[in-house]
Regions:
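PRPP-associated nucleotide enzymes
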Residues: 1-344
């Protein structure tokens, strides 16, 4: 197997940006590369094809279909006995269908005597249901972890989990990787001046601080929401100096875009000269598109962990590819090499 080391010319338009591959590892021992098999579910075949190109292999043949009653069917079309299998499937909309498809793929591989089955989940659905906030609720993120484990997965590879503690919901190894290298490279390419990294809420401070530290130790600001009394609107304050600066709002996902839009408006009110939104997962539930293209952002920067269809594209949107990060991680897992060293 040969990984591509050629650099792709970046395109900063609406199209997906193919970033240069990360530094590759040198295998410490010979291995049978024919034992690495890559398959894709139906959730994001474009990303899976990019990962396959990075690794220099083809996606494995697989039949997927839906019966008249709605049941899903999956069949692996080649022998995977004794192989290390990687199944690429983000649990994005429709979440339940894609999750069930992943479980069926994992089970099919286990029953086909695969040596190892790694569920590659660029976007982990139900991640926000990571704890009980009221009585008689499910901790659905834990339930999903149980389902994936019981289906027969040997390992999980996930990107930018909403809560890092989700790794502990699994009784199998979890490799948690980050989209920050491609996001940071893109921001650096723009040569922005007077950058301040902003967390849209208190819960995202650790994520924003880590991002700021890697962005040339940029200063950090926090948007703090407070409700003074019942039936009184929330008051939003900015902790930190943003006046005359280029504000980069950093979050793990953009869903309905309500939080990040409110953040942009309060930053403008406090004197920020430009506002960029930066997130890994483009969930984009209605009315996100209307909110994001309203002129409050210079750019909205996301990645392709979730496919963004043409009808959700707008002039300010930039979609970056994380295929090189996921591809390199798969290679390192297969070669028993360090994954964490990619993000130091």
């Amino acid at each position: 197997m040969i990984r591509s080391n050629s650099k792709c010319t970046p395109s900063w338009g609406d199209a997906v940006i193919h970033t240069a591959p990360l530094p590759t590892t040198t295998p410490s021992h010979a291995s049978d590369h024919s034992r690495l098999k890559l398959f894709s579910g139906s959730a994001n075949t474009a990303l899976a094809q990019e990962i396959a190109r990075y690794l220099g292999i083809d996606l494995g043949p697989m039949v997927r279909k839906r019966f008249a009653d709605g049941e899903l069917y999956v069949q692996i079309q080649e022998s995977i006995r004794g192989c290390d299998v990687y199944l690429i499937q983000p649990c994005c909309r429709p979440v339940n269908d894609h999750l069930m498809e992943l479980l069926i793929m994992v089970d099919a591989c286990r029953r086909a005597s695969a040596r190892q089955v790694t569920a590659v989940i660029p976007y982990y659905g139900y991640a926000r249901a990571d704890r009980k906030t009221a009585g008689r609720e499910s901790i659905t993120a834990k339930l999903v972890a149980n389902l994936i484990t019981q289906a027969g997965a040997s390992r999980v590879l996930a990107m930018d989990l909403h809560s890092a503690q989700i790794q502990g919901y699994f009784d199998i190894p979890v490799d948690h990787v980050y989209a920050s290298p491609v996001l940071l490279d893109y921001l650096r390419s723009k040569n922005l001046e007077d950058i301040v990294v902003v967390s849209p809420d208190v819960g995202g401070v650790a994520r924003a601080r880590a991002f700021a530290n890697k962005l040339d130790d940029a200063p950090l600001a926090i948007i703090d929401k407070r409700r003074q009394a019942h039936n009184v609107a929330e008051v939003m304050n900015v902790v930190g100096d943003v006046k005359g600066k280029t504000a980069v709002l950093v979050d793990d996902m953009i869903d309905t875009a309500g939080t990040i839009l409110e953040g942009a408006r309060v930053l403008r009110r406090e004197g920020a000269k430009e506002v960029y939104a930066c997130a890994t997962h483009a969930v984009f539930s209605p009315p996100a598109i209307e909110r994001l293209q309203g002129g409050d952002f210079e750019e909205v920067i996301v990645t392709n962990t979730i496919p963004v269809p043409e009808n959700q594209r707008f002039p300010q949107l930039r979609v970056l590819s994380v295929a090189s990060i996921l591809g390199e991680t798969i290679w390192r897992i297969h070669e028993d090499s360090s994954v964490s060293s990619m993000f130091r």
